[in-house]
């Protein structure tokens, strides 16, 4: 806190002197974690609204699939109406939270093919009778992935495993198959608490790979830090996480990744920042796979050619449309679809083909990003905005345009300026809303427009640079600057460019110490419209105290 106060006069000098205390126009609570698909949701939400009203709040931001209304049931709308009526009774403005690109939102309910696509280029297929099947080219594997070959405490073929004989051990008593596994324990024997095994593998650029491993845990802490990792340079090609219990019998973890322009990758399985407990790994595999979750939309075309590329075959004449009947973002452990030949096809039995397509990626446990360059996305937004207006005569809206972790990889957006594309996306969203209500005030999460947060190059799987994105969004957009610890540089960034800001803070802390830091910054920053109590873990115990601190009742 002392650092915050000593930096205030210097870092915020461009925003003017200490501002006189004025009542904040926006005194909001973030209502998150309820989808209105159960009666209990309303029962749990309304007491929060009542607490907010008692402590001087004037708005409730609701995140409850409000951009997928055409998919909802009558029961959903009845519950939404109950929440709306409660807000009216308590004099709280109900503010919808909609239109997520980073997390897909309602757009994926309409069409999962709108997911951003990663390119597979010229994968090998061989024709057998009336179908062509994918063939690994070249075959890849994890050498000694069964952990059967070792000398003493050292496993063969791996670049390293942490602290053999201290943290990592061959285990011939506990294994998934064969006669051994690799066990990790005593994580704090090294300061970082890491317990990993790594191997370098040669891959083919722009191919899709499936990696799996079997893991067993015993009193593992923290279990969420157990993961698979694929590194190419400084980029993580598979930023995936798994919900693994602290204690569990053998279970299989599987992910897919695209090699992109790389011909070698470093693959890891292990724990980062381990504290206690132990875990085992076994039967670690890696393989190139075919068109699992092939995306079909204008920006993700499928191309089939002869092996030398001299002949391009026609979909609908030479082969049936390549689709995946088992399409699922969550199930990768299944066979890839084959390419079916049609009667009269120019493709012959025994022929080798080169096939190109696009596939999605899941980030962490469940994040799937949609493509901002696909026109159909905005048709869905327009349709859903009209339905939302029928239910809620919204005067304010917050756009869920945070953490856009993919982009610039499918044909609809490859080569585009990602900062400009993001800004154009937001501008179209605002235009859609203002067609319906010309006076609507639009708010937006800050991170993708903040160079001190996520508005930069080399962001997750994005091919491109978000630097300068703030130059392409409407200037009357209110920026919801979010986070736990105060960030004066972020507030200054937006204030200097004439944006008003809403401070979305708290972030599930055990106390309001960080909120007090944000409060101090707000008093010295022009254009702060107010605060939003923001929790992602349904921690509302400090809701009343938050309001009392900031606007006092």
Name what the model sees in each region.
Residues 6-16:
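Bacterial N-terminal signal peptides
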Residues 25-139, 145, 356-473, 477:
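Aromatic-lined carbohydrate-binding surfaces of glycoside hydrolases
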């Amino acid at each position: 806190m002392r650092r915050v106060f000593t930096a205030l006069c210097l870092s915020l000098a461009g925003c003017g002197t200490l501002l006189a205390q004025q009542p904040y126009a926006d005194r909001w609570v973030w209502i998150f974690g309820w989808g209105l698909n159960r009666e209990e949701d309303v029962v749990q939400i309304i007491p929060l609204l009542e607490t907010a009203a008692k402590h001087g709040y004037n708005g409730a931001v609701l995140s409850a699939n409000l951009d997928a209304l055409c998919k909802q049931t009558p029961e959903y709308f009845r519950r939404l109406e109950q929440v709306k009526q409660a807000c009216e009774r308590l004099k709280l403005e109900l503010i919808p939270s909609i239109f997520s690109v980073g997390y897909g939102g309602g757009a994926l309910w309409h069409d999962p093919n709108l997911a951003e696509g990663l390119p597979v280029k010229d994968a090998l297929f061989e024709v057998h009778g009336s179908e062509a099947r994918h063939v690994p080219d070249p075959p890849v594997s994890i050498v000694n992935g069964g952990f059967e070959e070792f000398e003493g405490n050292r496993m063969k073929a791996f670049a390293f495993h942490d602290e053999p004989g201290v943290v990592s051990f061959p285990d011939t008593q506990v294994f998934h198959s064969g006669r051994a596994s690799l066990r990790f324990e005593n994580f704090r024997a090294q300061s970082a608490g890491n317990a990993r095994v790594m191997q370098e593998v040669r891959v083919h650029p722009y191919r899709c790979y499936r990696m799996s491993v079997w893991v067993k845990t015993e009193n593992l802490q923290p279990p969420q830090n157990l993961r698979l990792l694929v590194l190419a340079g400084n980029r993580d090609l598979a930023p995936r996480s798994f919900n693994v219990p602290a204690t569990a019998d053998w279970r299989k973890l599987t992910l897919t990744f695209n090699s992109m322009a790389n011909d070698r990758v470093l693959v890891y399985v292990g724990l980062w920042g381990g504290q206690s407990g132990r875990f085992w790994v076994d039967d670690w595999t890696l393989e190139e796979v075919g068109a699992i979750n092939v995306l079909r939309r204008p920006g993700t075309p499928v191309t089939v050619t002869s092996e030398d590329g001299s002949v391009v075959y026609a979909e609908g004449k030479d082969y049936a449309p390549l689709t995946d009947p088992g399409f699922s973002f969550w199930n990768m452990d299944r066979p890839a679809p084959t390419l079916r030949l049609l009667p009269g096809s120019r493709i012959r039995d025994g022929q080798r083909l080169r096939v190109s397509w696009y596939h999605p990626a899941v980030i962490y446990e469940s994040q799937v990003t949609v493509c901002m360059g696909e026109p159909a996305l905005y048709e869905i937004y327009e349709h859903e905005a009209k339905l939302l207006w029928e239910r809620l005569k919204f005067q304010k809206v917050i756009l869920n345009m945070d953490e856009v972790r993919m982009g610039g990889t499918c044909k609809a957006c490859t080569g585009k300026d990602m900062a400009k594309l993001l800004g154009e996306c937001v501008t179209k969203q605002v235009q859609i809303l203002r067609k319906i209500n010309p006076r609507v005030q639009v708010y937006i999460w800050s991170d993708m427009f903040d160079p001190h947060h996520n508005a930069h190059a080399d962001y997750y799987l994005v091919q491109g640079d978000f630097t300068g994105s703030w130059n392409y969004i409407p200037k009357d957009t209110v920026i919801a600057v979010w986070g736990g610890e105060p960030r004066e540089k972020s507030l200054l960034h937006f204030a200097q460019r004439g944006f008003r800001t809403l401070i979305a803070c708290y972030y599930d802390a055990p106390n309001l110490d960080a909120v007090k830091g944000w409060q101090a910054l707000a008093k010295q920053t022009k254009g702060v419209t107010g605060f939003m109590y923001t929790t992602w873990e349904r921690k509302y115990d400090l809701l009343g105290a938050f309001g009392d601190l900031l606007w006092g009742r």
